Amino acid sequence: LTIGVIATRRLNRRREILFLVVPVIFYLVVALTVGMNIGVRHILVVYVFLYVLIGGAASILIGKSRKWAYVVGVLLLVHVASSALTFPNYIAYANELWGGPSQTYKYLTDSNADWGQQLKSVGRYLDQRGVKDCWFLYFAEGVAEPSYYGIPCKPLPTISTLWLNVPIDVPNSIDGPVLISASNLSGVEFGPGSLDPYGQFKLLKPTAVIDHGVFVFDGKFEMPLAAAISKVQKARNLAQEKQLERALQEAKAAVALAPDSIQTQLALGDILLEMGQPQQARTNYEKALELAKTIEPEFQIRSLPDIEQRLQSLETAER
């Protein structure tokens, strides 16, 4: 409605419109180009200008005809009802034209949809159903502790747990229920396709959705890449402790589980190199390089230079 009012020049206040629109455009351009594009919270200031502009347009319409008061009133009531139905998980709020809060994670992630705020509701859900054996892929794992909320689930590895070096053992197959935070289900952390150890769940219909942010899946699931990632972490920790033979066993097991994983090939190559086997390490590095060239360009930028540097170091050492 506001755009229509401005386009038809019913709101004939050029200076006031510029005063409200220019800051919005400038702020959005800066916010979207500085490399800190991680959440709508960084652009909340633009809403102040937009709401004033919307209020001005509504005032013009109502002044022209009282019928517009009913239209504006209905739109406000719809917005209030939409917001109330999202309670208590306002972080994931999206209106129904967008698809509602349970669809937000498909388009936005992190603080736009899920910051791990559903633990109390997850605890109640499991308690009401008497669930004692489950798995939880929790966005804030390693930072917040689900067990404090009475959640008995075993954890699944996330980027955060790997970064914090939280040891997690994952078998090749697991029995549900499996609970997955929206930010993890989106796949934004590990990457798309073959990089995502939990990609299969995107194709499945959840049994339930808790607070628009935790998806519940029942059944038995094969988890080779997640299991391999947990073994890679264990292998690297053992290598740091100079337990190279055990580290080698874990790395080989990781490759056996997920031979088409860049992570597993690099881990095995690194450990072989540390054990004084550069030729064998080269084989794994070259396989990792081959795999890296098949992923999306955005993720190639992260992987290729690192792998190429390893291979270059090998060539330098051999001269």
Enumerate the language-model features and the residues they cover.
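Transmembrane alpha-helical segments
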Residues: 33, 57, 71-113
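Hydrophobic, aromatic-rich transmembrane alpha-helices
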Residues: 1-13
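Hydrophobic/aromatic-rich transmembrane helices and adjacent perimembrane loops
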Residues: 1, 29-30, 37-61, 217
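Membrane-interfacial entry segments at the cytosolic side of transmembrane helices
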Residues: 12-17, 61-76
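C-terminal luminal/periplasmic domains and tails of membrane-associated envelope-modifying transferases
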Residues: 98-319
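Transmembrane alpha-helix segments characteristic
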Residues: 11-32, 196-205
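Short beta-strand segments
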Residues: 1-4, 23, 75, 79, ...
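Lipid-exposed faces of alpha-helical membrane segments in multi-pass integral membrane proteins
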Residues: 2-3, 22-30, 46-49, 71-81
